[in-house]
Amino acid sequence: MDLITPEIGLFFWQTIVFLILLFLMAKFAWKPILGSVRNREQSINDALASAEKARKEMQNLQSDNEQLLKEARAERDAILKEARELKEKVITDASDEAKVKADKIVADAKRSIELEKQSAMAELKNHVAELSVEIAEKIVRKELSGKNEQHQMIEKMIGDAKLN
């Protein structure tokens, strides 16, 4: 137990050494240690503030990026919608134009057919008239080959003329 209980002289010298050490540390080391601790504390606070600022900046950038993405998507959708509308318009215009051209071609074909038909009918009438004249001429020559037949024909024509 003697080892655990310090003596008064030892206790006195330990206290004196402690106070001298405390004085020397306060005089020479305490200010640099406190300055170093303060500097460290300040650098930690600055780092925390910088990290918080960077976090807020990241949030702002992220929200800006999301906004830009939304705008880009909206613009893309608008461009796609406009492209679809333009495609539909082009298809409709082409279809209408093709229909108009087809109707014109059909009308021209009908007109051409009608003209060809009228031309063929006129040609046929002319041909029939020529044939009729030839046949009539042959018949008249045959019938009027004698004098007696000529007198009969003249009398018949006079009779027909009186009736009409």
Curated annotation (Swiss-Prot):
Alphabetical list of SUPFAM superfamilies matching this protein: F1F0 ATP synthase subunit B, membrane domain (SSF81573)
CC terms in the record's Gene Ontology section: plasma membrane; proton-transporting ATP synthase complex
Transmembrane regions listed in the UniProt entry: 8-28
Record-linked Gene3D superfamilies: F1F0 ATP synthase subunit B, membrane domain (1.20.5.620)
Highest taxon of source: Bacteria
Keyword annotations: ATP synthesis, Cell membrane, CF(0), Hydrogen ion transport, Ion transport, Membrane, Transmembrane, Transmembrane helix, Transport
PANTHER family from the UniProt entry: ATP SYNTHASE SUBUNIT B, ATP SYNTHASE SUBUNIT B', CHLOROPLASTIC
Oligomer status and interactors: F-type ATPases have 2 components, F(1) - the catalytic core - and F(0) - the membrane proton channel. F(1) has five subunits: alpha(3), beta(3), gamma(1), delta(1), epsilon(1). F(0) has three main subunits: a(1), b(2) and c(10-14). The alpha and beta chains form an alternating ring which encloses part of the gamma chain. F(1) is attached to F(0) by a central stalk formed by the gamma and epsilon chains, while a peripheral stalk is formed by the delta and b chains.
NCBIfam families: ATP_synt_b (TIGR01144), PRK14471.1 (NF011041)
Family as reported in the entry's similarity comment: Belongs to the ATPase B chain family.
Full protein name: ATP synthase subunit b
Species name: Christiangramia forsetii (strain DSM 17595 / CGMCC 1.15422 / KT0803)
Organism lineage string: Bacteria, Pseudomonadati, Bacteroidota, Flavobacteriia, Flavobacteriales
